[in-house]
Amino acid sequence: MKWIYRAITLGNPRQYQFEFCLWTLGIIRQMLKQEHGIILSKSAVCRLLQQLGLTPQRPLYKSFKQNQKEMREFLEKTYPGLREQARRTGALIFFVDEASIRSDSHRGTTWGKSGETPVVRDTGDRFGVRLISAVSPRGDMKFGCFEGTMDGDRFVEFLEKLRRDAGRPIIVIADNASYHHGKPVQKYQAAHPGEVTVANLPPYSPELNPDEQVWNNAKARLGRLFLDSKVTMKAAVKSTMLSIQHNVELVKSFFKLKDTLYAAIE
């Protein structure tokens, strides 16, 4: 049955003319029948997968628009060059990202009666908090809240906060949002030569940004809370972000994942 293991771990259902991209027991049953004429019940398929060491997991999604050449260029040349620049100038490297945390984003599970889906009542209102944060390989974390949408001027304000708090040159790595390399940012860098460098990750590659883990961590915590107003939510968000900020080892762990290990301190 090695071919089943290879099919599931190395491919996806679309390679077998299915419309779906996730392996479910139903899809695997159909694939077995379609490809090899093997008919098994769902329970039998489940036992077979367990024997093969396979378990149901929440997948990581990566864009098919990723350019592998650009990814290699960043990992093999761009980032090593930025790291060398940091070593030479004493600069501190930060990875930056923005996110919106919403009241209707719920995560986690709860115990309940078998066969009945538990109901958790909330206000039904929708409100959110917008944030920007930055993390460094040595465990530093900075964050800020803002109203409205992020733009070049707001991004520059955050860069200035990073520069002042660092007390030395900074290298900031962000995604390819237009305001990350627009005129306000270019003007700000020109006004602080040698003090602020802004670089960009390859397009469609959020997994390379360790700061993504700030949001994963924060949303996992906040998704379990009862937030009845925007005031309550802001207080909870600030408390959660401060908790992450004060946990240096947690922030360092964001750089120890498979896709972020390249940026860890050597």
Question: Positions of the model-derived regions?
Answer:
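Short functional hotspots at interaction and active-site rims
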Residues: M1-E266
